[in-house]
């Protein structure tokens, strides 16, 4: 880690450090919200209102995926930061490699389970016969592109832990801008005319672009993350438990948002059904 980042984490005035790290993190959080907003705007213009409803049904799935990725990312970042303070390079390395291993495995499992039980899951989340087709089209593509997305979330937390919050911010900006550019090209008839599938594809490509940027930063000589791809497959069960336990509160907090959306979707569906029955 270079002297400037070392000073930031260990010597610089606390207020200055908080501002330096908090501003990029805040911008990154705002940018995160742009993904679904941009998809919704372009889908509304390029497809129809039913497709917008489908994105709302699909949103809890993405929130749950994000909750898992943040659990791993925040848990590993916390362990990495404490190890860095102790100058414990072995624990720093194990926390990073284990987090990446967990990201790949968890993402693969969620993708497979999600693709197999997608329609049943969406009906549980409040989908109707009108919008479930759009939701399936959207999530079939999103789930396939899950691994780079999860790794991007994990690496963003880890680069923040080593004092490079700007890298995480730029990664998110790259993803958001790429999504904004690709959405109309893939969705509208003057482009590829793929509709909801186009929105999902644009999102996946945007996330891949963001992942490539943060991954290159993470393996650069300036980074202290010490990613060793050759040993990535080696399982450290003790570290898996540590990361999961440390990040579990974050998982619960983020997953609760997904369950709230699911509850609202089902209430809306129930009201709509009751209204149709009453009008008939």
Question: Predicted regions span which residues?
Answer:
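Residue-level signature of the transmembrane alpha-helical core
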Residues: 22, 26, 30, 64, ...
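Short alpha-helical transmembrane segments in multi-pass integral membrane proteins
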Residues: 1-22, 80-147, 192-247
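Transmembrane helical elements of multi-pass membrane transporters/channels
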Residues: 20-39, 141, 175, 206-210, ...
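Helix-loop interface residues and adjacent transmembrane-helix termini in multi-pass membrane transporters
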Residues: 34-37, 46-49, 83-86, 161-162, ...
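Alpha-helical transmembrane segments of multi-pass membrane transporters/permeases
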Residues: 103, 158-181, 197-204
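Small-residue-rich hydrophobic transmembrane alpha-helices
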Residues: 52-112, 149-168, 265, 279-280
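Alpha-helical transmembrane segments and their lipid-water interface positions
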Residues: 32, 36-43, 66-73, 77, ...
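Interfacial/gating helices of multi-pass transporter permease domains
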Residues: 43-63, 130-134, 196-197, 239-246, ...
């Amino acid at each position: 880690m270079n002297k400037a980042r070392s000073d930031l984490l260990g010597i610089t005035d606390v207020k200055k450090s908080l501002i330096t790290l908090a501003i990029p993190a805040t911008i990154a959080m705002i940018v995160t919200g742009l993904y679904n907003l941009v998809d919704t705007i372009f889908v509304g213009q390029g497809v129809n209102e039913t497709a917008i409803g489908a994105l709302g049904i699909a949103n809890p799935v993405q929130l749950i995926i994000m909750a898992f990725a943040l659990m791993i990312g925040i848990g590993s970042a916390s362990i990495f930061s404490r190890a860095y303070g102790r100058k414990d390079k072995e624990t720093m390395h194990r926390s990073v490699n284990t987090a990446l291993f967990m990201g790949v495995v968890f993402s693969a499992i969620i993708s497979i389970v999600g693709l197999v039980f997608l329609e049943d899951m969406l009906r549980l989340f409040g989908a109707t016969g009108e919008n479930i087709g759009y939701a399936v089209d959207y999530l079939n593509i999103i789930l396939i592109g899950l691994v780079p997305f999860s790794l991007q979330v994990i690496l963003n937390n880890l680069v923040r832990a080593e004092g490079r919050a700007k890298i995480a911010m730029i990664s998110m900006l790259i993803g958001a801008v790429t999504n904004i550019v690709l959405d109309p090209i893939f969705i509208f008839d003057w482009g590829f005319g793929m509709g909801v599938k186009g929105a999902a594809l644009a999102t996946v490509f945007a996330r891949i672009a963001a992942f490539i940027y943060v991954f290159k930063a993470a393996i650069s000589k300036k980074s202290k993350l010490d990613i060793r791809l050759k040993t990535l497959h080696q399982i450290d069960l003790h570290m898996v438990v540590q990361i999961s336990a440390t990040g579990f509160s974050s998982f619960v907090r983020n997953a609760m948002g997904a369950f709230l959306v699911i509850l609202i979707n089902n209430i809306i569906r129930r009201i709509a059904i009751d209204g149709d029955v009453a009008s008939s």
